[in-house]
Each structure stands twice: as structure tokens, then as C-alpha cells.
């Protein structure tokens, strides 16, 4: 079955596509700063379907440009990183981080050809341990998003990257689909095994009420179940344009994080997980009452393949379709790890990538639990069509400060307080 136009337009991100145009309005996380050694080898970088090369000069300046030399199309990945730019090893032409040809030793100076040659390049900034790229056309650049976690001291922020073999929207929707948590991640857990003061005891109630609304920057949801003494336990999360998810991994007072689901191309995504390391909140992988580890639940033990230099060679997980995502059927059979896959990131990876690189939305039978997914698709499509029709800027492009206040997490509130008011009361005064 052919994909619908909406389905296609939501996931295709190459230059000239509707979503590609919308994404290019924003600053995009491209790679970790540590991936670029000063004076070291260039890095192949696939971003929104464009083949780029990134490098760091000996002085520390970063450049991101088209991977092809404008002379004969040779790969600039093979080039020499020098002070002042990247030199093609074919004919010695050298390009600055601004894309100018600054040296052309194979052509006589009197021919005055050097100044007429440029390589396509993109503006870059570094923040929170990440190199950011702006791929749009504006002469006055937008500001970087002022997400709370990005404004903490860099030594208090951990950045995790992870590549997935599926489109960006599929991965984002996995983040905002909270109904899977009680099954995929903790389906083998019994509430009476969890410490009395740990919120995972509420996961025994596997069918919460879901409440969703649009926000200035995207959408948000609250998933609620009854708690003790006329209280409600709430898990609250956000989608923020264009590809950000703020998820409820800890108590809202301590949960300072953000995940970006950055399209490498139409069928591959790079996750950037920014996490505050100073959180004192109880972790999801807190030991059980017995002292035993929580079965199958870990947030940090991600196993990677060794990075290579090819276009898809960065931050690939060890588990993939070729080895059935390392599923352990015996572990699954005894029920302690519901999925048979160890680790939260690996579990999510298996589910999302097993759908295929681009799922046909026409084959889905969405349930009331999928309200956040439905509303988020509509929200994105609305912004996409307005941008496509008349260039209307999507949310947040020129409102960088608005990203600072949203917070995700879980919390208890009196049943008498409505969900929107309860959230506003809980985040009041929290932002660091």
C-alpha cells in the first residue's frame, strides 16, 4: 500500500521536502563535541539527508560543509585538516569553515579564480557538549533553544547518542507513547516488590486516564491513576517542536532532561539525550525491597558497536534486526523481563525499529491510549502545511526563551485539583 501524502510529508526530510523545510528553520544537534579532535580526522555527517563533513581545526574552530569538493566532486572526508580550514588532497584546494576557497596552489594567482569558488557550508555553534548546525536560509540566525538542561553547567550535563534504523517521527512517537511503559519496561515487576516510597508501585495500574492538550511549543500529556488518601499519581511529558521530547523519568522536581530525535535521513535517526547528572531523584532502576536489581531495567548500560567512519557508522547499538535485538527467550518465558530484552533503551529500540524504517499509518488501529500520538501528528501537520503554504514560521523558531519552562516528570496531587492546574503548581519555582 502506498503511503498517504500526510504520512510521506511527516517523515521525508531531504532538501525540498515540506518537513525538510520546516526542520531547517531550527538549530539541529549534529554530533558530540568530543567526536571532533582538534586537527584530527574529519567526520562523515549525515543530516536531513545531506552528506556533510565535519572537522575541527587545530585552533578548535569547527566547520561543517558539503562532503564534495566543488572542483571535481572528490570526497572532502579524505582531506587534510589544517589551521584555517580543510584541504582537498586531490588538487590541494583549501576551504575555510566559512566555505571560502582560501588557497588554490594548482592555479596561477594571476588567473584570479580562487575567489569565485565556494563550498556549501553551514553555520555551527557549540553548546552543552554538542555541535549544532543551522541548515536554513535566514541571514539573521535564530537563537539556540533555551531548554533548561542546555543552560546548566556542562559538567552537570551528560549527553548520550544512539542511532536507530527508523524515521524520526516513529522514534519521537515511541517517547510520547507512555502506555507501553507498564508492559515493555516493567511488565515482569510486581508492585509489592518495589520499595514503598518508590513511584513504580503505581505501575500495577496499567490503564491510566490520558489527558492531552496543545501548547505554545507542541503538545503535552498527563497519564493519571488513583493514589493514596485522595491523591492522583501523574506522569507528565511534552513534545516540543521540531523533534524534542521531555519524558517522565523521575520526580518532576529533579527531572531535568531532553531528548532530540534528529533525522539523519528518511530512515535513520540519531538520538541526543541531554540529562542533568545532579538529580537526586529515585532512579527507575532502584533496587527492589529484596536488594536485587530491578529486572531488565537500566538506563545507562547501553552496548554499542565500535564506531566506524561510514555514513551510518556512529553510535550504533549492538542489538539490531540481524541478531533479533539480543532477545533472550528464556528470560522472557520466566516472566522476570517481560520483553526478554535487557535495558530500557534496547527495549525501545527493538520495538521502534521492528516496525520497519517507515510505518504505514494506514495500517495502524490506534486506541484511546494513543491520543497523544494522534494530537501530536495533527499539531505537526498543521505547522507543516502553514509553513509549506506561506512560510509561516513553526513554533519556537523565534521564541527560544519559551523552551526554558517546560518540565516533565511524575508527582502526586490532590484529586480535587484539575490536571492542568496541578502541573502549573508543581513546576512553579522549580526551574533552575
From Swiss-Prot:
Assembly: This dioxygenase system consists of two proteins: an oxygenase and an oxygenase reductase.
PROSITE patterns: RIESKE (PS51296), RING_HYDROXYL_ALPHA (PS00570)
Cysteine disulfide partners in this protein: none
Keyword Iron in record: yes
Name used for this protein in its record: 3-chlorobenzoate-3,4-dioxygenase oxygenase subunit
Molecular function GO terms recorded: 2 iron, 2 sulfur cluster binding; dioxygenase activity; iron ion binding
EC number: 1.14.-.-
Signal peptide: none
Enzyme class: oxidoreductase
Family: Belongs to the bacterial ring-hydroxylating dioxygenase alpha subunit family.
Gene designation: cbaA
The organism's taxonomic lineage, starting at the top: Bacteria, Pseudomonadati, Pseudomonadota, Betaproteobacteria, Burkholderiales
Organism: Comamonas testosteroni
Annotated residues for binding of Fe cation: 180, 185
InterPro entries per the UniProt record, alphabetical: Cholesterol_7-desaturase, LigXa_C, Rieske_2Fe-2S, Rieske_2Fe-2S_sf, Ring-hydroxy_dOase_2Fe2S_BS
Cofactor or coenzyme needed: [2Fe-2S] cluster; Fe cation
